[in-house]
């Protein structure tokens, strides 16, 4: 038996999701980077299409399907029908901006400096657009006045206030799609 000297894992064919708003230059840079890293073949697919396929939405039918994909750096909004994208928009505001909004809110309202990982934990634990419960979350950070460690309790109301500017921008993007 002959043993293959080349493994298909050594030079894979890869599919990369890209934001709908990415420029041809950005797309080319992504492809070139993947090829330089050893990919045999590179194909790009827009993030909302990949999300719709993954969610099992009927994008090939004559009905409209809307996908809102909130990633780290971008929020992708797309309407698809009959196998194609009817409308798409990529907002440069998403999960990372939410983390930043929590960090800024804690600094402004509580004089508390928190790190990126703490801001992300707040988002995951108590982040909400509409306060429905009286949930609170203990946040540890550094007091900006004294420089000492400090812990404060924040509520869902704090979350609503912190996220409001980010969510307002996303809502406006969704309204544009409608």
Language model regions located:
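Nucleotide/phosphate-binding catalytic cleft detector across ATP-hydrolyzing
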Residues: 1-70, 78-178
């Amino acid at each position: 038996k002959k043993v293959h000297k080349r493994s298909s894992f050594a030079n894979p064919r890869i599919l990369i999701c890209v934001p709908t708003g990415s420029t041809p230059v950005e797309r080319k840079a992504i492809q070139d980077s993947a090829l330089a890293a050893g990919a045999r073949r590179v194909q790009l697919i827009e993030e909302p299409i990949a999300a719709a396929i993954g969610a099992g939405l009927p994008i090939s039918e004559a009905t409209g399907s809307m996908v809102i994909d909130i990633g780290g750096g971008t929020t992708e909004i797309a309407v698809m029908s009959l196998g194609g994208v009817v409308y798409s928009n990529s907002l440069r505001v998403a999960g990372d901006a939410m983390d930043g909004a929590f960090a800024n809110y804690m600094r402004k309202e509580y004089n508390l400096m928190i790190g990126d990982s703490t801001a992300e934990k707040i988002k995951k634990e108590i982040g909400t657009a509409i306060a429905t419960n009286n949930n609170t979350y203990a946040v540890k950070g550094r007091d900006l006045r004294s420089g000492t460690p400090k812990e404060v309790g924040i509520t869902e109301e704090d979350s609503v206030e912190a996220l409001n500017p980010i969510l307002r921008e996303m809502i406006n993007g969704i309204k544009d799609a409608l």
